[in-house]
């Protein structure tokens, strides 16, 4: 009996010590309950935002032989027409949404489809990937699609012209004139601003964002942004046999040649960067650069900016900013993958180029009569799109661009955490040969250069010939919505109730 009483007394003492050691506004049970209620609340908030109505451009039903759709890696006839039964089996697999169904899709070669089942993954932060909406992609025979392809062909012809020479290069001026006469072109048409984005900051200062030129403080090492470049003048898929093999899913028979590293000077340089970057690389680098500039460039809604006894780190500091950038990027990819595979299935520019060669009657007259198409015909003996990569486009549909969707999400996160109207310290541009950086007098803002970074990464894919302008513009807007949704969930989890602000791509200022 005495022994039992003794152990009971010891247990009571230990219990009291445990309670005394737990310095927390809530008991463990209360915290456990509130964590559940928070998650339930956020789920309800996101659930009450009704899912979008998903509509495509109708080409799949209205254009013969699925000519307006993505069908790379499926079997094709000699003229590039996809095997209809194989395409219908792809549609069956998409509808089924199962691993087994995709394994049964007929193949024209060993190259695999790029992860179509990713469209079915659920999200635990922000809204579900299927909730976000997009407008339909430009229809195959439309004037807008024609204008976009004229631009992509012009970029293919001008890959090696330095951005700094645009106002003096005769071929750039011809391309600008060719785009200016198109009725539905949505990009800039002056030689100075050719192939730039359309958002605030895109058309100010050098073509390339400061966040792709500035040194990166990567932990104990400072990394410059000189990158090896692809050999000038080297293009791919310019013969019908090479083009058809790639469309069937054969491995490329050629490879790229690289040259000495330099700062980016040309469209080809930019296309090389977005060929081998990891998903959120450019935005992680931008975050590291911004963090190195200190609290003066933090958003004014960050309470730690003026705190005297507390510093930001795990929340509202480097750890959380870097994590949120990566998190937003992957969520944006899932949203893009749903739109690509389950809604639009838009053909890639190289497939459009195949139609230019084999079935031009399906295309708009403004494309078929363009001077840029004549230049390609004269140079290569056919109308196929000269590609920047040996393998051409990735094996997933064009609309929206994955790179652009990541851009929109990650840049939105960065614009929330940092002060957009703060100026970039000591702006630079590359020397004529790209070996060094030189100071410039332009007044550039963080927000403008982040927008430009997003557009650079998006348009860099166009420079390679793997995307159209609207893939990028609309992809960035999709990514922006993903980023905002994640930030709203993030905000409600914080005891400080931070009130960060950002300016959307359309210029609207919002508070998270």
Which residues does each predicted region cover?
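Hydrophobic alpha-helical bundle signature of multipass membrane enzymes
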Residues: 21-469, 473-512
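Gram-negative bacterial Sec-dependent N-terminal signal peptides
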Residues: 1-20
